[in-house]
């Protein structure tokens, strides 16, 4: 069941869902609109051979940029972080979507689930499929998070729990 405006406001007012900072236009009809944070990550190299199964982490492959504008080259991608620090209830899952207006410019994100019990800034991959450089501004609404009631409870305990700022991917050594 998708949680609508009234249910979202109840979760926030009772402290079960935390969104900090909470702007007046964050809670929407059927989800939360989250904003671009103050840093992003982009690949530091082009043409490198990346072998996730051989890496402990991939931080060295990315350049972290602190800026008021996010520059996404044509047919490239960046990792964006939300301005908001989110703490999810243990029985609610988030489904992340790019705001449709941004998709109409050629931006896409992969299907992304924010697990029940997750806490942190959300890092999301944004791909520019267009032939043009696209420039986004810090603080603009970019991510629409649909919240869905889960059957039962779960507690997220993954690598990205408690992350702050943009977080490059972990390596997959030991998982392959």
UniProtKB/Swiss-Prot annotation:
<feature type="binding site">
    <location>
        <begin position="99"/>
        <end position="104"/>
    </location>
    <ligand>
        <name>dCTP</name>
    </ligand>
</feature>
<keyword id="KW-0547">Nucleotide-binding</keyword>
<dbReference type="GO" id="GO:0000166">
    <property type="term" value="F:nucleotide binding"/>
</dbReference>
<dbReference type="GO" id="GO:0006226">
    <property type="term" value="P:dUMP biosynthetic process"/>
</dbReference>
<comment type="function">
    <text>Catalyzes the deamination of dCTP to dUTP.</text>
</comment>
<dbReference type="InterPro" id="IPR033704">
    <property type="entry name" value="dUTPase_trimeric"/>
</dbReference>
<keyword id="KW-0378">Hydrolase</keyword>
<comment type="subunit">
    <text>Homotrimer.</text>
</comment>
<feature type="active site" description="Proton donor/acceptor">
    <location>
        <position position="125"/>
    </location>
</feature>
<dbReference type="InterPro" id="IPR011962">
    <property type="entry name" value="dCTP_deaminase"/>
</dbReference>
<dbReference type="GO" id="GO:0008829">
    <property type="term" value="F:dCTP deaminase activity"/>
</dbReference>
<dbReference type="Pfam" id="PF22769">
    <property type="entry name" value="DCD"/>
</dbReference>
<feature type="binding site">
    <location>
        <position position="163"/>
    </location>
    <ligand>
        <name>dCTP</name>
    </ligand>
</feature>
<comment type="pathway">
    <text>Pyrimidine metabolism; dUMP biosynthesis; dUMP from dCTP (dUTP route): step 1/2.</text>
</comment>
<feature type="binding site">
    <location>
        <position position="115"/>
    </location>
    <ligand>
        <name>dCTP</name>
    </ligand>
</feature>
<dbReference type="InterPro" id="IPR036157">
    <property type="entry name" value="dUTPase-like_sf"/>
</dbReference>
<protein>
    <recommendedName>
        <fullName>dCTP deaminase</fullName>
        <ecNumber>3.5.4.13</ecNumber>
    </recommendedName>
</protein>
<comment type="similarity">
    <text>Belongs to the dCTP deaminase family.</text>
</comment>
<keyword id="KW-0546">Nucleotide metabolism</keyword>
<dbReference type="GO" id="GO:0006229">
    <property type="term" value="P:dUTP biosynthetic process"/>
</dbReference>
